[in-house]
């Protein structure tokens, strides 16, 4: 799988921390088979951090990068080369190359119905300074959107009225380097429910507040997280 490229720690990590794994579209041809795993969020984060902190030749610094630093590649020329990055604190890290893994934080906005907030997901701040720096270097920004379903407290749910959905009996690892026998473990079920006339009524009465229909957000998507 493509997750095994460049070391593939994401695939290895989900194999260690998934709570359910399922191969989707198995009734169709192999070209559309899609492996889906759901993780214990805290375990995934802790395990990935442990791996990073114990990786040789990797130094970790926590800071908000606000500026990409460059200089002319040739005297009098228009082309530029990277010289480093600058943090919001003023600290400068010199380098010859920069890899940006920005996720969904460049100029991020979170939209809840008719409320829009200039922030990243889960209350984490958006990388607005870095966004401005990239624009200054001639890099165009396009808006992508994701849709995140509401999180429900399991204590408020009547599971007896829902359909239980199990993970695969024989789990396929995400990483080719994972021993398949190490991922055969007890899993957490998913649960399926349906809308009804009441939920349809609520939706119809509030369509004008939905950013997908009101035009409040634009961009390619959506992707559900």
At which residue positions do the language-model features occur?
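Conserved N-terminal/central alpha/beta ligand/cofactor-binding core
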Residues: 1-69, 89, 101-121, 125-131, ...
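Intrinsically disordered, low-complexity regions
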Residues: 30, 77-78, 85, 168, ...
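Conserved beta-strand-loop-beta-strand element in the redox core of flavoprotein oxidoreductases
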Residues: 67-92, 98
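Core structural elements
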Residues: 98, 102-103, 225
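Active-site helix-to-loop segments that bind/position phosphate- or nucleotide-bearing substrates
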Residues: 206-225
């Amino acid at each position: 799988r493509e997750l095994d490229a460049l070391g593939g720690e994401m695939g290895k990590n989900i194999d260690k921390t998934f709570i359910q794994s399922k191969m989707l579209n198995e009734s169709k041809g192999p070209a559309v088979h899609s492996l889906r795993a759901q993780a214990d969020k805290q375990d995934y984060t802790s395990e990935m951090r442990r791996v990073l902190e114990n990786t040789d030749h990797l130094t970790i610094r926590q800071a908000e990068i606000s500026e990409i630093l460059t200089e002319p590649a040739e005297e009098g020329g228009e082309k530029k080369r990277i010289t480093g990055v600058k943090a919001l604190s003023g600290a400068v890290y010199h380098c010859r190359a920069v890899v940006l893994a920005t996720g969904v934080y460049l100029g991020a906005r979170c939209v809840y119905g008719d409320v829009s907030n200039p922030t990243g997901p889960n209350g984490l701040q958006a990388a607005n300074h870095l966004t401005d720096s990239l624009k200054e270097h001639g890099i165009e920004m396009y808006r992508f959107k994701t849709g995140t379903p509401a999180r429900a407290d399991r204590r408020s749910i009547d599971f007896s009225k829902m359909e239980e959905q199990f993970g695969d009996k024989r789990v396929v690892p995400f990483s080719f380097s994972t021993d398949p026998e190490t991922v055969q473990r007890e899993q957490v079920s998913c649960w399926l429910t349906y809308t009804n006339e009441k939920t349809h009524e609520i939706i119809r009465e509030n369509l004008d507040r939905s950013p997908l229909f009101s035009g409040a957000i634009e961009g390619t998507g959506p992707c559900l997280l």
